[in-house]
Amino acid sequence: MCGLRFIMGPVRLEILLFILAAYGAWAEATKEEEDDTERLPSKCEVCKLLSMELQEALSRTGRSREVLELGQVLDTGKRKRHVPYSLSETRLEEALENLCERILDYNVHAERKGSLRYAKGQSQTMATLKGLVQKGVKVDLGIPLELWDEPSVEVTFLKKQCETMLEEFEDVVGDWYFHHQEQPLQHFLCERHVLPASETACLREAWTGKEKISDGQEEADDEEEEEEEEITKTSGNPKHDPEDL
C-alpha cells in the first residue's frame, strides 16, 4: 500500500499542477476580456472625443462670411472693430456651448475594441436584442425596457470627464483656436498638453469601415441570426450586462 501511495503521489501532484496552470491561463484570459468590456473610459479616450466634437462643431461654421461689429462708439470717435465671424471668439464660445452634453449621444459598442467602442448610433448588440424583443423573446438586462437607450455609466463618465478636462485646459483650447489652427486639435491638445507620450495610443485608433458590410445584406442578416441563436440557446430568458451594449 505504501508503494502504491508512493506511485500515486506524484501523479496526483502532476494533475493538480496541470489544473492550477489551466485555471491560471483561463483567469488571465478572462481578465483581459473583462478589462476591455467592463471599464471606464481612459483620459486618452476622453480627450480624443472632446477634440473630435469641438473640431466637428467648428467645421460647421468655418465657411461663414459674416462679419461682427465689436466694441462701442465712444466720444473719442473710435469706431467699432469689424471681425470675421470665422475668427471671432463668439464662434468658439458657440462651439463650446453644450459640447460635453453632446457626448451623451454616444453609445458603447461592446463588439468593438479600444476607443472605437465609443461611437454614435445603436450598437450591433443592442440592435440584436431589440430584434429579439420584437419577436417575443424575453430579454433580461436588469433594467426596464424603456431605459435601454439611456446613457450608460461609461458614457456618463465620459461626459463628466469631458467637462473637467475642458475646464482645466480652457486656455489651451483658446490658444489653439486663435494661434494654432493649422494643427489638428487632437495633436495640439491631447498630445502636446493633456497626455504623456506613453498614453496616446488611442489617438491612432481609427474606424476603417472594413468591419461593416457595405453590400451583401444577406451576410449581415446571417450574422444577426447566428447571434440570436446563440443568445436563445442559453435559455428563454437571456441575460446581458447593459454596460456591454
Curated annotation (Swiss-Prot):
Q: Name one GO cellular component term.
A: extracellular region
Q: GO MF terms on file?
A: signaling receptor binding
Coiled coil where?
Answer: 209-237
| Signal peptide as annotated in the record | 1-27
Q: What is its main location?
A: secreted
Q: Which GO terms describe its biological process?
A: positive regulation of protein localization to plasma membrane; regulation of protein localization
Q: Which cysteine pairs are joined by S-S bonds?
A: C44-C202, C47-C190, C100-C162
Q: Which UniProt keywords apply?
A: Coiled coil, Disulfide bond, Secreted, Signal
Query: Region (Disordered) spans which residues?
Result: 207-245
Q: Report the superkingdom from the record.
A: Eukaryota
* Reported tissue expression: Highly expressed in lung, spleen, thymus, and uterus. Moderately expressed in kidney, stomach and placenta. Weakly expressed in brain, heart, liver, small intestine, skeletal muscle and testis.
Location in or out of the cell: Secreted
Entry function: Plays a role in the regulation of the cell surface expression of TLR4.
Which family is it part of? Belongs to the canopy family.
User: How does the annotation summarize its subunit structure?
Assistant: Interacts with TLR4.
Question: What is the name attached to this protein's record?
Answer: Protein canopy homolog 4
Name the species this protein comes from: Mus musculus
Gene behind the chain: Cnpy4
